[in-house]
A protein has these predicted regions:
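A short beta-loop-alpha structural element at the N-terminal edge
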Residues: 8-24, 156-165
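Active-site rim helix/loop that mediates acceptor-substrate recognition in acyltransferases
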Residues: 23-30, 34-72
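A short, internal acetyl-CoA/4′-phosphopantetheine-binding micro-motif in the GNAT/acyltransferase core
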Residues: 60-62, 85-92, 121
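Short strand-connecting beta-turns/loops that link adjacent beta-strands
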Residues: 64-67, 75-79, 123, 139
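A conserved beta-turn-beta hairpin within the catalytic core of GNAT-like acetyltransferases
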Residues: 74-83, 92
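Conserved acetyl-CoA-binding loop-helix of GNAT-fold acetyltransferases
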Residues: 87, 93-106, 129-133
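Conserved GNAT acetyl-CoA-binding A-motif
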Residues: 101, 108-121
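Conserved catalytic-core motifs of GNAT/GCN5-like acyltransferases
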Residues: 119-121, 132, 137-150
Length: 165
């Protein structure tokens, strides 16, 4: 059952917002996220370009001029990637995430795409339940390895060699 909050929520194309506004709402939805993933406007613009995010078909949830959430749609070769779903923490569990997801699925269908995929952080049980409810299913586990940034070149190894005849 979708709540009255979700019913009163408008889904607006993300293209109607600036990159700065999108970065702001995205970051607000992630303040308590399992894995910190903040993005400034420049980094979000790079993400949009790298992952072929279609802002015209991506969505922002809006109610009474208040941004409540965001969801983005990446499009490549007949496939849709539903990504960057986020809902403000104090408005979660009211159907906004579901409304955004259903909106993205509808946007993909408008593009004649019927293969939708997504990723979810392993311990994000609420999102995982939502995705299963919407007909998605697990196909595997993606392992992401990260190393700390490397700021200086490694020390040069100096070796001495001597010819032995």
């Amino acid at each position: 059952m979708i709540s009255s909050v979700a019913i009163a929520t408008n889904l607006i194309p993300a293209s109607k917002f600036t990159i700065e506004q999108l970065a702001s709402i995205y970051n607000q939805t992630r303040v308590d996220y399992l894995v910190p993933m903040p993005m400034n406007a420049l980094r979000l613009a790079e993400y949009i370009s790298t992952y072929d995010v279609d802002l015209e078909h991506s969505l922002v949830a809006l109610q009474d001029d208040r941004l409540l959430g965001v969801a983005m749609l990446g499009v490549r070769e007949g496939r849709a990637w539903l990504t960057r779903l986020g809902v403000l923490p104090n408005t979660r569990r009211n159907g906004i995430g579901e409304a955004l997801m259903l909106g993205l699925i509808a946007q993909a269908e408008k593009l004649h795409i019927h293969f939708d995929m997504l990723e979810v952080i392993k311990d994000n049980a609420p999102a995982h339940r939502l995705f299963l409810k919407l007909g998605f299913y697990d196909v595997g586990e993606l392992l992401v390895l990260r190393r700390p940034p490397f700021n200086q070149p490694p020390d040069t190894v100096v070796a001495d060699a001597e010819r032995l005849d």
